[in-house]
Amino acid sequence: MNHATSELHDESAVTDVPETTRVQDLLALVKMGIVNSNTLTVFTGFWLALHFNGLNALEHLDKMFFTIVGSALIMAGSCSLNNYIDRDIDHLMERTKNRPTVTGKYKPGFVLTLGVTLLLLGFVFLLLTTAMAALIGFIGAFTYVVLYSLWTKRAYTLNTVVGSVSGAVPPLIGWAAIHPSLDHPIAWMLFLIMFIWQIPHFLALAMKRVDEYRNAGIPMLPVVHGFDITKRQIMIWTVCLLPLPFYMSGLGITFMIIATLLNIGWIVLGFYGFRKKDDIKWSVQMFVYSLNYLTILFVSMIVVTFF
C-alpha cells in the first residue's frame, strides 16, 4: 500500500467510524455475543451434572458463580486476544471493520494486556471449582488463540474444524466443575453437539461472507473450494447431529422429540439448498436456523429436568 493510499484509508477509517461508548467498545472487544451464547452451554453442563449426580443447586451456588464467571472471563480473554491477532486484517471485512482494534479506540498493547489478564483471572476462578475445569478452560483458550487464531485460520480450510474444538469445551467446563471425572456419556454428548454444530454454523457464515473472507485472504472452505462442496460439507455435518439425542435418553422422551424435530428441520432446510438458486439467501437461512437451534436445544435440556 503506497503512502497516498494509506492516507486515504486512514481518512475514510476516521470518517466511517460509528459513534460508540466506551462500554460498547469494550463489549465488542471481548465479543460479548459469543461470551453470552457460550455461557449458556457452560451453565447447561453445570446444571446437568448436578441433575445426574443428584445434587442440590442451592448447595453449590458458590461453584456456580465461580464456574460461570471464570468461564466468561476465559472466553472474553480469548476473544480479546483474537482481536489483537486479527487487527491487521479486520479492516478488510465488513463485519469486523468497526472493531475497536481497527478504529484505534483501543491500542494493541491494552488489548493484549486485557486479554492475558482476563485469561489469568478466569483460570483462578475455575481453580476454585476443580482442577479439571481449569484444565479444560486452558485447552479451550489454547485451541482458540494458538491453534486457530495464530496457526490454522489463515493457512488451512480445516480452520473451522480446529476452531470448533474450542467452542465445544464450555459445557465440559460446567460439568467438570461438579463432576471432574467426566465419566457420564451426557457430558460427552454435549461436547459432540457443540463440536458438530459449529461446523455447519460457521460454514454458512463463510458462504454469506465469502467475498469478505476472500478479500482478507482467509482460506475458508467456500473461498477455496466453492459453494457446492461447502453445501455438501454442511449437510454431512448436520446429518451427524441426528443420532446424538438418542444417546441422551436420560433426559427423557420429550427432549429426544424436541431435539430430533430440530435436527430434521435443519436437514430439510439443508437439502432445500441444493434446489435453491440463491446460495447466499440459503446460507443466511441456515445461519439463523443454527442460532435458534442451539438456543432451543440447550434451554430444553435444562427445562426437562424440572419434570
Curated annotation (Swiss-Prot):
Subunit structure as annotated in this protein's UniProt entry: Interacts with CtaA.
Record's signal peptide: none
Protein's UniProt name: Protoheme IX farnesyltransferase 2
Top class in the EC scheme: transferase
Bilayer-crossing regions: 32-52, 65-85, 106-128, 132-151, 158-178, 186-206, 251-271, 287-307
Primary residence: membrane
Annotated organism of origin: Bacillus cytotoxicus (strain DSM 22905 / CIP 110041 / 391-98 / NVH 391-98)
Classification via InterPro entries: Protohaem_IX_farnesylTrfase (IPR006369), UbiA_prenyltransferase (IPR000537), UbiA_prenylTrfase_CS (IPR030470), UbiA_sf (IPR044878)
Top-level taxonomic group: Bacteria
EC code: 2.5.1.141
Reaction it catalyzes: heme b + (2E,6E)-farnesyl diphosphate + H2O = Fe(II)-heme o + diphosphate
Keywords from the UniProt entry: Cell membrane, Heme biosynthesis, Membrane, Transferase, Transmembrane, Transmembrane helix
Recorded name of the encoding gene: ctaB2
